[in-house]
Amino acid sequence: MRTFLALELPGETAMQIADWRDRQFGHVGRPVPPANFHLTLAFIGELSESALERLCLTTEAWLADGEPPGGEILLDCTGYWPKPGIYWLGPNKWPETLSQLAGKLRHLTTAVGARRDRNAFRPHVTLFRNCSTAPPVTAPAISWQYRHFTLFESRQGKTGVSYHPLQHWELTPQNN
């Protein structure tokens, strides 16, 4: 099973991003469907069902010691990674607690046999794949609150990739 841990975007936030993207861009690559928008915390890749069960158990044990906090993210910058051809929207700055959450989840995934992700954590929402160049555009300012994270399975189908939630974990509500 090909899996990853991520923050889900609320439906209205995903549609807001898709509307902005679709108004700004022509054909610069393959657009990611709004239903697939997410912010990856830890890429797991292929892992057996028994290893995924261990991951769920260790995650629940870690959370039993106290849920990490949720938070708010302002998506206010765009970026481009030429090697994979990814054009993305992300935060210019993000809460340290988000980096800590991603770091802990990456540690838990490698502890159950997932390959260690050597890339630095850079929160982002992928807008386009197979993008040959970074389009010059001013980023919007779209904020959203994250209150849980999700274990997703990635499935390849006739119409492309789809992501299916397998497990959700709550985060402590942010104090405002």
Protein language model annotation of sequence segments:
Residues M1-N176:
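Histidine-dependent nucleotide/RNA phosphoesterase domain, centered on the 2H-phosphoesterase fold
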